[in-house]
Amino acid sequence: MSFDLIIKNGTVILENEARVVDIAVKGGKIAAIGQDLGDAKEVMDASGLVVSPGMVDAHTHISEPGRSHWEGYETGTRAAAKGGITTMIEMPLNQLPATVDRASIELKFDAAKGKLTIDAAQLGGLVSYNIDRLHELDEVGVVGFKCFVATCGDRGIDNDFRDVNDWQFFKGAQKLGELGQPVLVHCENALICDALGEEAKSEGRVTAHDYVASRPVFTEVEAIRRVLYLAKVAGCRLHICHISSPEGVEEVTRARQEGQDVTCESCPHYFVLDTEQFEEIGTLAKCSPPIRDLENQKGMWEKLFNGEIDCLVSDHSPCPPEMKAGNIMEAWGGIAGLQNCMDVMFDEAVQKRGMSLPMFGKLMATNAADIFGLQQKGRIAPGKDADFVFIQPNSSYVLTNDDLEYRHKVSPYVGRTIGARITKTILRGDVIYDIEQGFPVAPKGQFILKHQQ
């Protein structure tokens, strides 16, 4: 058989091992894995490189339509491709209107036409005002529903995202359980975090340490514990977003051991930044839950290596620079990070701490694809989409603002020495990013809908 593409001599991350092996691609799919596979129209030599499944980033905010001046599909998905992401799962908030019904998700589909460099799946929102319309988003094909039990949304904008109270969460979870959809939750205690934040601001306590103190670990743990119990009673599968504390992870582990269907994610910034660095970097490193101290970070690494965290995600949530001006308590909370998930974590987890390549592949791609039912994604295996990223190990560079593809070229990682590089990203058999050529093809990304899987 003649193939479209053969990738030769790379160290390939397979599901349970990593070895030097060749990959054949035909019609955008992985056709064969082995040696001496035959002829191909194109042969790529990956000698000295790690060939990983393309990252499945299960937590990305693209603010188009309505707030494309924050981040748009064109810039956001180019940055993703440059960072080795081939599929993103897009959050239902930051854009206007929020993605809470059929009409709003159709606006997103229209806004993205001709702009997607990578593939994208969608999450619907569970908010205080759409519980009777959740079925609309399920019918369209979202792969899950996101909600906040922390305060969110601009109360001055009618169609912005909104948090839910316990009753709304419970009723929504019941309906999502009936639909077979997971609920994803931002877990912080709204009343306590809001009160502590207002108290700090009124007393002039506005440093990074003050911000972290206003959102203490117990506010995350309490919220996780609460939604675990409510989701269990409601009969709904649960996914905890961006866990920032080992104590929070322990709640998920305990629930799993008791038989509950629950998964969780965390983000690179909780593993490579700490509160002291947050103080130095300033508002660009503000997010919620916050970046905590070094002892907390050490505990998170332990949980990651123990296999208690299912996947790593960017939680890419940028904004215009003026919204990061002023003191930390007043600035927008969100990190621009999707371009540097894979290289930073390959350096920190694999090269510096000895994580196995198969575990890295699961954390960056396989587990997220499985959790959200993306059956063609997340694995280098025959029949799957030919989505790959080439990683050059032990190749250091210093990240600059000019390296970034975001709408606004800022990131808390600027100035960081990163010890690995993404050299090529391939989506369904086509190179969508190359370190020498840039972006050699027109945007070819597609939306992935649940019922098409």
Curated annotation (Swiss-Prot):
Which positions does UniProt annotate for Zn(2+) 1 binding?
Answer: H59, H61, K146, D315
Cofactors that this protein relies on: Zn(2+)
- CC per GO annotation: cytoplasm
Relay the cofactor remark from the entry: Binds 2 Zn(2+) ions per subunit.
Give the enzyme's EC designation. Answer: 3.5.2.5
Q: Where does Zn(2+) 2 bind?
A: K146, H186, H242
Q: In which pathway does it act?
A: Nitrogen metabolism; (S)-allantoin degradation; allantoate from (S)-allantoin: step 1/1
* Residue numbers carrying N6-carboxylysine: K146
Keyword Glycoprotein part of the UniProt annotation: no
One Gene Ontology biological process: purine nucleobase catabolic process
PTM (free text): Carboxylation allows a single lysine to coordinate two zinc ions.
Q: Which domain of life is it from?
A: Bacteria
PANTHER family cross-referenced by the UniProt entry: ALLANTOINASE (PTHR43668:SF4)
Main role?
Answer: Catalyzes the conversion of allantoin (5-ureidohydantoin) to allantoic acid by hydrolytic cleavage of the five-member hydantoin ring.
How does the annotation summarize its subunit structure?
A: Homotetramer.
Q: What is this protein called?
A: Allantoinase
User: What gene is it encoded by?
Assistant: allB
